[in-house]
A protein has these predicted regions:
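A generic structural signal for residues embedded in beta-strands
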Residues: 73, 121-124, 238
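Short, Lys/Arg- and Gly-enriched loop/turn segments at beta-strand edges
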Residues: 78-90, 129-140, 244-254, 347-349
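Intrinsically disordered, low-complexity linker/loop segments enriched in Gly/Pro
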Residues: 128-231
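Short, structured beta-strand/loop micro-motifs enriched in basic residues and often containing a Trp
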Residues: 46-56, 100-108, 213-221
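N-terminal, Lys/Arg-enriched amphipathic/low-complexity engagement segments
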Residues: 38-99
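Conserved mixed alpha/beta catalytic, RNA-binding, or beta-rich assembly cores of soluble enzyme
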Residues: 182-188, 195, 199-306, 317
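Bacterial N-terminal signal peptides
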Residues: 8-20
Length: 375
């Protein structure tokens, strides 16, 4: 299944991108306005609520919510928050080896969304992101990890630097003379996946004997997407594989370039990432896709970067030829993707490489910019 549009007779909802509830993602931390009738929950990053490197579909949900409710989720940084000032590269390597096969990510969850069934789509609105004040970036020693990081062999000893974040200016100093604006987004956002699904097992060691799935690789369930467009005000669409969806998030980033070439971003933690999951019964989704105030974004992930590009373009063409804003043929969709589509390398360091293709909403002139129709 791919992103598609329900038949007009079944349409129950129109998502208008130009609604006032959408604000420009970026320096600000506010996004959509949640529905007035929704309930609000808080999920703290306690030891009971955080797992290290694995999605386990057998985990008891830490929250059970209804579609449209909002949740403020706290996150902690890699390796259960153990990477902090004073820890040197030897200590980071030791932590990496302690969780062999699993990802380095600390993930908070899972959250069960009542009514979500396999075949549905979860629309996840990112309402607000409030970072904590500490961050780091590192690349592992290329002599020990020659394939981890794009230029790993050229940096045999590895490198780590810790940063203090100015959360008023939303900036950090890289070094004297270089200041970086913060653009927080969740590097990892996932729904649960059936461990018996053959594609989920591709590329060991993505799963283990317990039926858990590593957080390391991105896939159809989202996971380690590292898509830097998922800032406050954006919306992520994920296919549902398991009853209740089962939502996790972690790998919190405060800034990342496309490619994430040295292995890590400006890795941080969130005091709060507020989300609003909504179950869409008639919106069918294959690969994750997203939207911001300005663009629709379609993703592809594969060990082969060319194949990741192909998947992203296929999703783009299918969506364009299915949308109801300005109907078009597949041939026209393919042409439009080539003329205005902006396909970017999401990341090249998560074994499964990523490409995302962005279609600007502004080209649909004089039209109400409807993201999709379905319920």
């Amino acid at each position: 299944m791919r992103p598609s549009v329900a038949a007009p007779a079944t349409l129950a909802l129109v998502l208008a991108v130009a609604l006032a509830g959408h604000t420009q993602p970026g320096k600000g931390s506010e996004g959509h306005a949640p529905a007035a009738a929704s309930k609000h929950y808080v999920l703290p990053a306690t030891p009971e609520n955080v797992q290290w490197g694995w999605y386990d579909p057998g985990e008891k949900p830490r929250l059970v919510i209804n579609s449209g409710d909002t949740v403020s989720i706290e996150t902690i940084s890699h390796s259960l928050g153990q990477i902090k000032p004073g820890l040197d590269m030897d200590g980071i390597v030791k932590l990496r080896k302690e969780n062999d096969g699993g990802g380095p990510h600390s993930i908070t969850g899972p959250i069960y969304v009542s009514g979500a069934e396999p075949g549905d789509t979860l629309e996840v609105r990112i309402l607000k992101i409030v970072p904590k004040p500490d961050a780091f970036n590192f690349n592992l020693p290329g002599k020990d990890f020659p394939t981890v990081g794009l230029l790993a062999p050229e940096f045999p000893e590895g490198f780590v630097r810790y940063y203090k974040l100015d959360l008023v200016k939303m900036q950090t100093q890289f070094k004297p003379g270089i200041v970086i604006d913060l653009q927080p987004f969740p590097g990892t956002f996932a729904v649960g996946v059936d461990p018996n699904e053959p594609d989920a097992k591709a590329g060991p060691p993505i799963h283990d004997a317990k039926g858990r799935t590593s957080t390391l690789r991105p896939w159809k369930n989202g996971s380690n997407m590292d898509l830097n467009e998922l800032q406050a005000g954006s919306t992520l669409y994920l296919p549902v594989f398991l009853k209740g969806g089962l939502i996790w998030t972690g790998d919190s980033h405060c800034r990342q370039g496309n490619g994430e070439v040295n292995l890590t971003a400006l890795e941080c933690a969130y005091k709060e990432i507020e989300i609003q999951p909504i179950v869409r019964k008639h919106l069918k989704t294959d690969w994750p896709w997203a939207e911001t105030k300005t663009d629709w974004i379609f993703m592809g992930y594969d060990e082969d970067l060319n194949q990741a590009m192909k998947i992203a373009v296929e999703q783009t063409v299918h969506w364009l030829s299915s949308q109801q804003i300005v109907p078009m043929s597949r041939e026209e969709a393919y042409a439009l993707a080539s003329i205005v589509g902006d396909c970017r390398v999401t990341q090249v360091v998560d074994i499964r490489k990523g490409v995302h293709c962005m279609i600007p909403k502004r080209v649909f002139v004089g039209q109400r910019q409807v993201a999709h129709q379905g319920s």
